[in-house]
């Protein structure tokens, strides 16, 4: 299926993508590769990013082990700021003008999230990286990605992960699992397909923002998926 071309997109990167082959933290070579993938398409689109923090700290997992949930979630938000700065650094090293905006104000390291300012950055050809989730506990970075995509008027939300789309079962556990080319938001919610958390999916559904799930670990795949030729799943109404 040929996916339509878009003008403004939001790219959600899971924190785990930045680990490379490691089990924790940030792998500079992987971040540099991802930055090159982004730079290759940045001249054709107005591009925003949301980066997860799971490679450094997972609030939900920490809460399950006894951390106060609110404190754990704030720690997870701070982890996303570290990742955002790492991606910004990698992009600017290859000449891509970038701004980081945080939902939690920290003026010494990045801008606060101001939608109108973010709009101006995009209009000037800069990439805007949104950090610190929504700024509120109990919300995932998937929800933050959906929220920012809606606020910024993005035409689509691209989720770059370590899998090549959405399956009707876990392909790592079930060899007969089938990958969807397209699937509706309502099917994702009804069947509890693991695309994003339910609040993020519902927000995209209600604002008619398609979600494209693809494997960003595969070199060159971001450009192929944006062109409509890569392997991915599109979630839409």
Swiss-Prot record:
EC number: 2.7.4.22
Signal peptide location: none
Binding site for UMP: 53, 73, 134-141
Assembly description: Homohexamer.
Keywords noted in UniProt: ATP-binding, Cytoplasm, Kinase, Nucleotide-binding, Pyrimidine biosynthesis, Transferase
Pathway(s): Pyrimidine metabolism; CTP biosynthesis via de novo pathway; UDP from UMP (UMPK route): step 1/1
Enzyme kind, highest EC tier: transferase
Catalytic activity: UMP + ATP = UDP + ADP
Protein name in the entry: Uridylate kinase
Regulation of this protein's activity per its record: Inhibited by UTP.
NCBIfam families hit by this protein: pyrH_bact
Disulfide bonds: none
Top-level taxonomy: Bacteria, Pseudomonadati, Pseudomonadota, Alphaproteobacteria, Sphingomonadales
């Amino acid at each position: 299926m040929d996916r339509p071309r878009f003008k403004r997109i939001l790219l959600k990167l899971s924190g785990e993508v930045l680990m490379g082959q490691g089990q924790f933290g940030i792998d500079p070579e992987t971040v540099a590769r991802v930055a090159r993938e982004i730079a290759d398409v940045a001249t054709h689109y107005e591009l925003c990013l949301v980066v997860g923090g799971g490679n450094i700290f997972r609030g939900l997992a920490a809460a399950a082990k006894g951390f106060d949930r609110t404190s754990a979630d704030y720690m997870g938000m701070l982890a996303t700021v570290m990742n955002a700065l790492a991606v910004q650094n990698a992009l600017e090293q290859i000449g891509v003008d970038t701004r980081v905006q945080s939902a939690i104000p920290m003026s010494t390291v990045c801008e606060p999230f101001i939608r109108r300012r973010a709009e101006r950055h995009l209009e000037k050809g800069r990439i805007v990286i949104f950090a610190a989730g929504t700024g509120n506990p109990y919300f995932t970075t998937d929800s933050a990605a959906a929220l920012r995509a809606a606020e910024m008027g993005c035409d689509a939300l691209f989720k770059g992960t370590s899998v090549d789309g959405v399956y009707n079962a876990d392909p790592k556990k079930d060899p007969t699992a089938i990958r969807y080319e397209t699937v509706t938001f309502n099917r994702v919610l009804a069947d509890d397909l693991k695309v994003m958390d339910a609040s993020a999916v519902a927000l995209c559904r209600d604002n008619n923002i398609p979600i494209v799930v693809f494997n960003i670990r595969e070199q060159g795949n971001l450009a192929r998926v944006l062109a409509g030729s890569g392997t991915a799943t599109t979630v839409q109404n």
